């Protein structure tokens, strides 16, 4: 790849976008997804250290191996996803500028880069505990095979399947310290699993025409907005009891989680009254991003004291 290339088919505000090889690589591995998953990985690891009474600095080697290893398997999985989806990504506005579509990164480069990153990441996780590496592999397999290759283009439950892989990072972080999955770790998994479904359904509403153009059977494409809204409400409601299983982390965590859940549910119910469904979907999507960030960062901050 050249150090700097011009993207000829995309312009933003009339300007041709210029990218570098490094930016193309970050786009290939979906750096935003990598960063957001690192938050949840770190939270799972931090809470395992906290509950076990272990020192953070005394386990810095484990912390670094876990964070770097997790980053690599997530990045590698995203690269393989970009490789596999390159035949449909050009049909969607939000994905047609990916380097695997524009030709900035060749298919074989994307595939083998992804495989190499996954292999290196699993090796690093194996240097913490076997369980962390096993869970990491399960996450990779679920995202690459069960989601990307199997369900994404065939079934509306693709969102549910994909949410499994997105919920494993805190389990990786936890087991890298403990070697087994504790109750708190399972609760974190469930929060993330359930959270992703309304999060991505809100995005699917916003990008319905994109998904329709690519023939991807997202729920709003197949069953319409009203069914999707009801599904979003059901999944958000499923989050309500989960903070009460985190009592060992302190009452503030329980209260904050409950407030975030109730706020999201109220906003969700407003969707039945709002006439502009795209505005509502945007509000739901933004709320979901803040929900995840605030809650998982708060779990770390509140357990510092």
Swiss-Prot record:
Q: Which reaction does it catalyse?
A: heme b + (2E,6E)-farnesyl diphosphate + H2O = Fe(II)-heme o + diphosphate
Stored PROSITE patterns: UBIA (PS00943)
Source species: Bacillus velezensis (strain DSM 23117 / BGSC 10A6 / LMG 26770 / FZB42) (Bacillus amyloliquefaciens subsp. plantarum)
Q: Which InterPro entries match?
A: Protohaem_IX_farnesylTrfase, UbiA_prenyltransferase, UbiA_prenylTrfase_CS, UbiA_sf
Q: What is this protein called?
A: Protoheme IX farnesyltransferase 2
**Chief localization:** membrane
What's the miscellaneous note?
Carbon 2 of the heme B porphyrin ring is defined according to the Fischer nomenclature.
Homology family: Belongs to the UbiA prenyltransferase family. Protoheme IX farnesyltransferase subfamily.
């Amino acid at each position: 790849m050249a150090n700097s290339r011009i993207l000829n088919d995309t312009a933003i505000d009339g300007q041709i976008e210029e990218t570098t090889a490094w930016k193309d690589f970050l786009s290939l591995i979906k750096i935003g997804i990598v960063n957001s998953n690192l938050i949840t990985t770190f939270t799972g690891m931090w809470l395992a250290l906290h509950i076990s009474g272990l020192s953070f600095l005394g386990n810095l080697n484990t912390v670094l191996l876990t964070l770097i290893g997790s980053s690599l398997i997530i990045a590698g999985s995203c690269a393989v996803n970009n490789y596999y989806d390159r035949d449909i990504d050009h049909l969607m506005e939000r994905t047609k500028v990916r380097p695997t579509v524009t030709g900035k990164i060749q298919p074989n480069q994307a595939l083998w880069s992804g495989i190499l990153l996954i292999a290196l990441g699993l090796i690093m996780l194996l240097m913490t505990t076997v369980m962390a590496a096993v869970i990491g592999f399960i996450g990779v397999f679920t995202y690459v095979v069960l989601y990307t290759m199997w369900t994404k283009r065939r079934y509306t439950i693709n969102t549910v399947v994909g949410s499994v892989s997105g919920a494993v990072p805190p389990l990786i972080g936890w087991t890298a310290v403990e070697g087994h999955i504790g109750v708190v770790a399972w609760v974190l998994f469930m929060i993330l699993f359930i959270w992703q479904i309304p999060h991505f359904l809100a995005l699917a509403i916003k990008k319905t025409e994109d998904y329709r153009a690519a023939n991807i059977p997202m729920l709003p494409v197949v069953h319409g907005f009203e069914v999707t809204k009801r599904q979003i409400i059901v999944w958000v409601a499923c989050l309500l009891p989960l903070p009460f299983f985190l009592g060992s982390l302190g009452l503030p965590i329980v209260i904050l989680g409950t407030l975030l859940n109730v706020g999201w549910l109220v906003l969700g119910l407003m969707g039945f009254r709002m006439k502009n469904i795209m505005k509502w979907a945007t509000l739901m999507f933004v709320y979901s991003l803040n929900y995840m960030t605030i809650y998982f960062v708060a779990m770390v901050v509140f357990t510092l004291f």
